[in-house]
Amino acid sequence: MFRAALIAICLAVFPTALAHAAGKTHEVRIEGMKFVPERIEVATGDTVVWTNKDFLSHSVTAKEARVESGDLAPSKSWRFVARKTGEMPYICRLHPVMKGVLLVR
């Protein structure tokens, strides 16, 4: 009886803990020569996916954080897992007027 109850508790708690550990996924669109949204706040462990919906190639480049997506051709995506807290300003290396901020809490 005790063993069955323990297994039931583990099965109820483990999926929740696993989902929390994996973090959430957030989307940033690249369109109209902008990052949309331009500012996004995420938690440590969350994933941010930038998808290029523009007709030009773009990048996600944060020099201070040493983050670089490489060139993203139209319709391509890039994933980044936020591991360090703080503010990460970034630009498109190909079009430096395009700016965004990733805030990791």
Label the predicted regions.
Residues F2, C10, A17-R105:
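Extracytoplasmic copper-binding redox domains, predominantly the cupredoxin/blue-copper superfamily
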